[in-house]
A protein has these predicted regions:
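A gly/proline- and charged-residue-enriched helix-loop-helix capping module
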Residues: 86-110
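N-terminal secretory/targeting leader peptides
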Residues: 1-88, 108-109, 113-296
Length: 296
């Protein structure tokens, strides 16, 4: 009997993550019957619901920005530390085997999930409808959408913003309603969610190098035969490499596409970046005071 695998995501057809999931499906569809809902927000469901739906087996496989998992695994806040990593390679290098093992074990032992891999969720930058965000003074009073993550909320508040934490579903609605002055996201989301229609000032802040968790329901995975598990595991490894390469290619192309949408792009100077880093330092220290085993 052919096993059915139910897959879901939260982004549109052209996004890196949806293209990546389609690659995963291509690799496994000779062995499984697949159903794939590309974007659950089109059905008025919040992106964050993917976690619970995958935990309870309503769906089998999904992906989601690591920030949405921090209430389950506080160690994941390491990947969200603002202005902490030198660059994307530094972030990937510090996502080492020790940290991966901690996350894998907690997902498996406490949350009914098996980690299939980490995806590149893109370098996060800040956009605004009012001005470039070159210094903390530029943040003052602006309503910014953040993810529903306490570290993000506290960080942007400390910069001077008025944080408005929103799931992807509500973020899209807030953009349409004109409820936001600013937002922070990787370029793929800035483009796919058409942020450029209302926010014409994009500042390359590179404040967070984001990751997605690629997951499968534990019960589903453990119900598979040895051969089926190997297919899922090997296909996941291939998919993870495919995703990182695709994400890098897209990031290089997106700036050109965004500029064509009449968006002005500026890059924060190293001197001004230090001002944000100085404010962020207290969040780094607070995290490592609780998780000093991750200070590497």
């Amino acid at each position: 009997m052919i096993k059915n695998i139910k897959i879901a995501g939260y982004q549109g057809k052209e996004s890196v993550h949806t293209q990546t999931m389609n690659e995963f499906i291509r690799l496994i569809n000779h062995k499984f019957s697949i159903s794939f809902v590309e974007d659950i927000t089109n059905y008025n469901q919040k992106a964050s619901e993917l976690i619970k739906q995958t935990q309870n087996g309503e769906i089998d496989v999904s992906y989601l920005f690591s920030s949405y998992f921090t209430h389950l695994i506080p160690e994941l806040m390491y990947l969200d530390l603002p202005f902490y990593f030198r660059n994307k390679n530094d972030a990937f290098n510090k996502l080492n085997e020790k940290l991966k093992k901690i996350i894998y074990n907690q997902l498996k032992n406490s949350h009914n999930l098996i980690l299939l891999g980490f995806w590149d969720n893109g370098t996060r930058h800040i956009s605004s409808s009012k001005k470039f965000i070159n210094t903390p003074d530029d943040c003052t009073g602006q309503i910014i959408r953040t993810t529903p993550n306490q570290l993000h909320i506290d960080t942007f508040k400390s910069f001077g913003f008025k944080p408005k934490p929103l799931d992807v579903l509500d973020f899209k609605k807030a953009l349409l309603n004109g409820d936001l002055d600013a937002q922070e996201n990787p370029l793929t989301n800035f483009y796919q969610f058409k942020v450029y229609e209302t926010q014409k000032y994009l500042t390359k802040t590179s404040h967070v190098y984001g990751f997605c968790l690629f997951i499968i329901n534990k019960k589903c995975f453990e119900s598979l035969s040895h051969d089926e598990k190997e297919i899922i595991t090997n296909s996941s490894n291939i998919t993870n490499s495919f995703q990182r390469n695709l994400a890098t290619e897209e990031e290089n192309l997106l700036f050109k596409q965004i500029i064509k949408k009449n968006v002005q792009v500026s890059e924060i100077t190293l001197k001004n970046k230090e001002k944000f880093k100085k404010i962020s330092k207290k969040f780094h220290n607070s995290f490592f005071s609780k998780h000093n085993n991750l200070n590497f």
